[in-house]
Amino acid sequence: MAKAVTIKIKLVSTADTGFYYVAKKNSRTMTDKMTKKKYDPVARKHVEFKEAKIK
């Protein structure tokens, strides 16, 4: 069987609230770390989320 192209990653809030989203990423086309600006309900505002490994 072939290796899966998409992998699951954790997007952790840079506001240090501990909140995170789980997202999928194509490991072949997106080789660099993913960053997205999304809503953090703990901080109650839009902040940048950075990629981290799911343990």
Curated annotation (Swiss-Prot):
Pfam families with a match to the protein in the record: Ribosomal_L33
SUPFAM superfamilies found in the cross-reference section: Zn-binding ribosomal proteins (SSF57829)
Signal sequence range: none
Superkingdom of this protein's organism: Bacteria
A Gene Ontology biological process term: translation
GO CC, alphabetical: cytosolic large ribosomal subunit
Keywords: Ribonucleoprotein, Ribosomal protein
GO molecular function, one term: structural constituent of ribosome
Record-linked HAMAP family: Ribosomal_bL33
UniProt family annotation: Belongs to the bacterial ribosomal protein bL33 family.
Protein name per UniProt: Large ribosomal subunit protein bL33
Naturally occurring in which organism (per UniProt): Rhodopseudomonas palustris (strain HaA2)
Gene this chain is encoded by: rpmG
